[in-house]
Amino acid sequence: MGKMILVTGGARSGKSAFAEKLARESGGEVVYIATAEAWDAEMEHRIALHRNRRPSDWQTYEAPREAAEVIREAGQEHGTILFDCVTIYLSNLLCREAEPYDEAKLAALVQGEMASLIEAVQGLPEETTVLFVTNEVGAGIVPENRLARLYRDLAGLANQQLAAAADAVYAVLCGIPLRIK
């Protein structure tokens, strides 16, 4: 069974940089699973920042959806997988759904997808480590629209599910990682 580490924090908290540091320190081959899609210039810039920080020898997979299969395949040959990030992946899932949003259906969809990611990690060799990066979106103000509130709630549930299954959990605040599990 592979090892699972969850790294959470707010926007620009340093969580990705910390997860990248853990991946580099692993000493083995690293696979980077990118979940973001560039829909506008600002997102293109964010993706470029992440891409420029990564070592050139890391293998990158673009997986905006159906990432469990990518984890299964990559984890058989590589010692460390960095999945960045869960909350972007979650937004990709939600964007596929049509309005009106059925909260129970979306909760089941998210729970099922998180279970698939967890099962993929559990099926890996024990020497494989998967680092999941996620955003802590529930610590701010209550969003003004229904979809944003639903996203916040589903992200919180997804993070809880991943944290419960993780071997270690880090919260990154102001660039400082704190191990909370």
Give each language-model segment a name.
Residues 5-75:
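Conserved P-loop
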Residues 28-31, 79, 129, 168:
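Residues at the starts of beta-strands that form the adenosine-phosphate
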Residues 1-2, 76-77, 108:
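Catalytic phosphate/metal-binding cores of nucleic-acid and nucleotide-processing enzymes, i.e., regions
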Residues 80-94:
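A basic- and aromatic-enriched beta-loop-alpha substructure that forms the phosphate/nucleotide-
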Residues 19, 50, 82, 135, ...:
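Residue-level signal for inorganic ion chemistry
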Residues 1-15, 23, 29, 160-181:
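Charged, low-complexity C-terminal accessory regions
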Residues 26, 56-57, 77, 124-127, ...:
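Structured helix-beta-strand junction loops
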